[in-house]
Amino acid sequence: MTEQKYIVALDQGTTSSRAVILDHDANIVSVAQREFTQIYPQAGWVEHDPMEIWATQSSTLVEALAKSGIRSDQLAAIGITNQRETTIVWNKETGKPVYNAIVWQCRRTADICEDLKSRGLEDYVRDNTGLVLDPYFSGTKVKWILDNVEGAREDAEAGKLLFGTVDTWLVWKMTQGRVHVTDYTNASRTMLFNINDLCWDQKLLDEMGIPASMMPEVKRSSEIYGKTNIGGKGGTRIPIAGIAGDQQAALYGQMCVEAGQAKNTYGTGCFLLMNTGQEKVTSKNGLLTTLACGPKGEPAYALEGAVFMGGASIQWLRDELKILNGAEDSEYFATKVDTSNGVYVVPAFTGLGAPYWDAYARGTIVGLTRGVNSNHIIRATLEGIAYQTRDVLDAMQADSGIKLANLRVDGGAVANNFLMQFQSDVLNTEVHRPQVTEVTALGAAYLAGLAVGYWNSIDELQDKAVLDRTFEPHDDEEKRNRRYKGWKRAVKCAQTWSELHDEDD
């Protein structure tokens, strides 16, 4: 009997760094987590300290090993998944960042984006990167650092500076500066990567004044990039063998590796990704085209849509309206009534995301009558999350021409059985909830394990993807269509609110 080996996933998120150790049956053996500082230098700006990201991430690996009594020489490989778009620029000679990491949420580069739009680059960005010209993505963040940090542009042009998303920074640190790489999924979120030719886009680098020498080499999401001694005693060298951005790692962890397979992560917002296989689909409905992973970690195309308010709308019921003590109580109260009594809640608190992209829409409750109570409003709020998910999935199916096979789900809100059943009814599609909901870490671990032969094939992994529950649609077509029509009317009310204000003026 050979000694038990394990895979570790490093999950570097927006608020914390985690290490998750898995065994051969994909059971979680040990988890360690450390939060780190959120830095807000001014309104709309968000930063992290790259050295703190590194310190918290490396210490979680040591801690996860110590907690479980697993030795470093029992690790078959390390997989990395990370918050996407967050941008780090560092000096390759000193290993020191020239500025804090500029986080994906940071809006400081809005003016740079407007300038690029005025130069007619919007269509070029959409056609070649699959993205919209927005401060969310890495490209304008790199330009900002080069333009605003003293000496940065000169050093960059002299070949002294390197750029990376968080995955690149971690691999560079773990290999003592020997390896400067990223994977296709992270590269596709920079707004600097051509997803048609699968290479850095020279025109966009030139337009933003970014030297090509700063860019990491782009590799598949499943291969050995280098080896590390991190957490290792003496000469133990552990292969770093998997990299994927968090949403793409979740897509892979859910085994959505073929065209038409999709997942929804129900967090603060909702992140929907649909694998479209080897065919690049350009959205006509405000979705992003991005790169994901095929069965062997090779690049595949995907459509991505985000809903701004998912679980956050339940927090609003708890914190602001105070009609819930805990978010988990929402299921109990929603099932105290048979219907939402004609009420629709459109949680457009910060506008509407895909497929509407209406920054001026505002939250709306419509259909109120004297018989409506707090349970109806709680139920309608949960239903609103499911309707928004249908809005995005309808757009994905229209864009791709691919019928959704089923919806795989993960994230905190999937514990809510009422929401999951209603989601199935609204979509007229099966909803699959996995037993292990740590799908982001699973995805990174699977990619790493396949690269080193820890698992032999995607088929072996499919067998490990045990479902906790399958929700099947119950509604008849007439009822489903009538409800959804009502939702569309409610959304129109949310969108008309600001237009009416303009007319009053």
Curated annotation (Swiss-Prot):
**Which residues are recorded as binding sn-glycerol 3-phosphate?**
T14, R84, E85, Y136, D246
- Pathway terms, separated by semicolons: Polyol metabolism; glycerol degradation via glycerol kinase pathway; sn-glycerol 3-phosphate from glycerol: step 1/1
Q: In Gene Ontology terms, what is a biological process of this protein?
A: glycerol metabolic process
Q: What is its EC number?
A: 2.7.1.30
Question: Superkingdom of the source?
Answer: Bacteria
| Binding, glycerol | R84, E85, Y136, D246, Q247
Residues annotated to bind ADP: T14, R18, T268, G311, G412, N416
Q: Which UniProt keywords apply?
A: ATP-binding, Glycerol metabolism, Kinase, Nucleotide-binding, Transferase
Which EC class is this protein assigned?
transferase
Which reaction(s) does the protein catalyse, per the Swiss-Prot or TrEMBL entry?
glycerol + ATP = sn-glycerol 3-phosphate + ADP + H(+)
Coiled coil segments of this chain: none
| InterPro entries, per database record | ATPase_NBD, Carb_kinase_FGGY, Carb_kinase_FGGY_CS, FGGY_C, FGGY_N, Glycerol_kin
PROSITE patterns, per the entry: FGGY_KINASES_1 (PS00933), FGGY_KINASES_2 (PS00445)
UniProt GO MF annotations: ATP binding; glycerol kinase activity
Please state how the activity of this protein is regulated. Inhibited by fructose 1,6-bisphosphate (FBP).
For ATP, which residues are the binding ones? T14, T15, S16, T268, G311, Q315, G412
Record-level GO cellular component terms:
cytosol
Could you tell me what this protein does? Key enzyme in the regulation of glycerol uptake and metabolism. Catalyzes the phosphorylation of glycerol to yield sn-glycerol 3-phosphate.
Q: Which family does it belong to?
A: Belongs to the FGGY kinase family.
Q: Name the HAMAP family for this protein.
A: Glycerol_kin
What is the protein's given name?
Glycerol kinase
